Every structure is written in C-alpha cells, then in structure tokens.
Amino acid sequence: MAIHVIQSQRIEVLLQEMLRAGHQPSANPFEALKTQHFIVPSAAVQAWLTVRLSEHQGISANRLFHQRIRAFQWFAYQAVLDNKEKVRKANIPRMIIKWRTYQVLKAFLQAAENPLALDHPLHSIIQRIYDSASRLSSGTEQQLKKQGMLYWVSEQVSRLFSNYMEYRGHCFKQHAAGQACDCSSNWLKDWGQNQPLDLDQQFFSMQTAFPGLDSKEQLAQQRQVSDFAKDQAEKLEQWQRWLWHREFHADFELMQGIDDDFWAIMDHPETRAAALAKLPKQVTLFTVLDLPPSQLAFLRRLGQYIDVLILHFNPSQEYWADTVDANWKKQYDVKLKQRFKDKHPQASDQEIEAFFEKYTLEYGQMKESRHPLLTRFGKQARDHFSLLVNLAAGENGEEWEDQFPADYQDHLLGKVQYDILNLAEPEQGSFAFNEQDDSVRIHVCHSALRQLEVLKDQLTYWLSQGSGERPRSP
C-alpha cells in the first residue's frame, strides 16, 4: 500500500494509465463488482472521464466520483466513523458559512446609522456597508443597497473562511507530544483563542526588495505605505477574528475532532481491519485543480493503508518548481540596475553589469524564468508540482513514474509544446512558419459576446471535421 504518482504532459496518457491500473489481476472474482473511486477536480472532468471510459470499455458503471480531495476525505470519515450524524454536522459547506455570516452581520444593519462603537471589531466592515448606501436618499433604496452589500460580503467571507480552513488551520511541523503548535501559518489556532495575529512579523517587517540600495527617502516612503497597509490589515484581521471566534471556531474544532477520531481507528491494530473493509482498496486522483498541503498530507497518511494513484498533468518533464515569471524578472532586473545608477551616477556599463552579477548571486535572486508561457500562466501548476515532487524521494514507500512521450506534430503548436516539455526558452526565428499552419489561431474580438460567438463557430467547425479514424458521416 502506497502512493503511486504518474505524471505526463498528455491527458490521454494519464487516461491509459488509469485504465491499466483498474485492470489489475485479482484472485477474487467479486473484486470486479466493487465500486471504483475517482477524485476529479470538476464536474466537467467527471463527464469527460465517463465518456472516455465508456468508449474504451463499452460501458461506464459502478464508479463513484468525488469532487476534489475534500469530498473523498469526508466520504472516508462517513464510512469509517459510527456516529454518522456527528460527521454530517461537522462538514460545513460554503453555502452554510455564507448564510450564517449573513445572519450575524444583519443584526447590526437595522438602525439608520452604524450602532457599533469605534473600538468594536466589526465597526469597519459594518461602516463599509453603511457607506455603500449613504448617497441614496430613499430609505427603501438604502435598505436594499445594504442588503445587497451584505450578501456580497457574506459571499466573500465564505470564500475566505473556506480557504482558511484548508490553508490556515493546520500544523505542518513535527511537535513533541503535548507541545502546542507555533506555526505562523496556523491562523485559526490563534483566532480560536481570540488572539490577534502578529501582522508585523508576517507582513510588515520592512524587508526591502533591494537591500543596501534604498535611500533614506525611499525607505521613509516604504515605511509610510507600510503603516497605511498595516492599519487596513489590522481592521481586516479584527473583524474576521471576531466573526471566526464567535461563529465558526466550535465547528472547526469539531471538524478536527472528526479527523482525530478517524486516524485513531485507522492507526489502532484492533480496529483497522474493520475500517479498511469500509474503504476502497484503491482511489485514483485524476489531475488536480487545487492541492492544499493538509489534503496532500491526508492522502500520504491514507496511502499507508490503501493504494492511492495520483495522475498528475505536468506540461514539462524538467524541474521547474523554482522558476519565476519572465516579466517579473525583467522588471526586477531593470529596477535593480536603476537603483544602482541612482546611487552611483558616474558608474560605467561594465561596473553596472559587474554589480548586477554579484548582487543577484549574493541575495539569491538568480532564478530562471525559462519558458515564458509556462512561468507566466502556470503558477498554480508550479506550486502543485513543488508539493508533489517531495514524494519523489520515496521516504514512505511512494512510487514516482514519468510518462513523457516526445513525439509532436510538425506545426507551431507542436513546437511550443516541445519547448515547454524541455523547458527551453523560445528563440526568434527557430521555427519556419507555414502559411497553411492553423494550429494556433488568434481572434481579435470587440466584446465578450463576440468572443463566445467566435468560439461557437470554431467548435462547430472542429466537430464537423471528424478524424481519420472516425470520419464524419453526413
């Protein structure tokens, strides 16, 4: 039992690997009747997989799809733990967070003016809702405007708190038994105790982007901007902390208790066998849209007891977890050289270049930008890769497999894909352009509606063409 990661730049290769993994020989003929479990990033991928599996196998049945890792996580809790009602209540979807936030804040919006004192944690957010309707003369219009603003705020809070529960509510260090978590990223632990975050340490420690080059005036300006941003951040932190501590902390503690109960059963030798009988022997993660470290840690721990197959879409076979946006690096380099010229007006070009090479090496800013399309539009995929690449060491028995076919068609799109695969920076004039090459098309549209119309026309054209293997029948 372990985690097996297969990565490829082609979705069809990942599909074939999934089919191969689902046809492992078994001595028990009834294994074929058991439900197969798949974790997919969206309903669209689920529909695509269902169609492709039907094409390859003639039928798609007895398969259970889970929308993202979180859904499978709560499925496992529900299957293993006996108190089903407790598990059901502990799982709080975003819709519940939104309406509970709406009800809490609504009580402070009934008066004609903000009823809260200036030192109340909610004063800033309630005042913002009142200000949104301050220019309206009609009382009815003001009330409708405040309700609309309150609904928008509640929607944003539900997004924030859902992300906090995934990214800001867990301890990622190995602590001794009984030792409290001191992770700076574990915000919800501090908020649960109604303790404010150390914003100075996390965000406003005055770490200049160009050490040793900023003048006194530039440092003073940065400090002034930092003070304003800090004041705004403190107001945000105050009302979010108050709302979390009052309304959602107890629910989050219950969620963490559910996780503790689950692993207590899985880790105990006497209860493990009965729990494993309620779980699938294998779960397949088909590509990822988001990958919170806490959910990856759940899969790694679960991989000690069942097979976890991760099919990861990776456009490049090279290591690119440390790449940066090419535009960002260019702007940074230009600003760096300009700061040096401002401080040393008489410096020659050779002195500027010598300083630039020494400075970038000394402060660790010599990062590669590599292929601009990948580094600019693939930041989230880069972060996912940097998390998954930790599994390549196989410390807990994880297996890693690369499937990167290098055959590409001889057109412009194939050239771009090949460069991204090998993380090669594009060179001007490296590809002979063919006027008949329509692999990449650029349409300039005057509105979003026109974009949809062009997209519809193109999809209709592509669907009407068919292929060599499956020609379109009139």
Regions found by a protein language model. Give the residues of each.
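Nucleic acid-machinery interaction/catalytic patches
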Residues: M1-P474
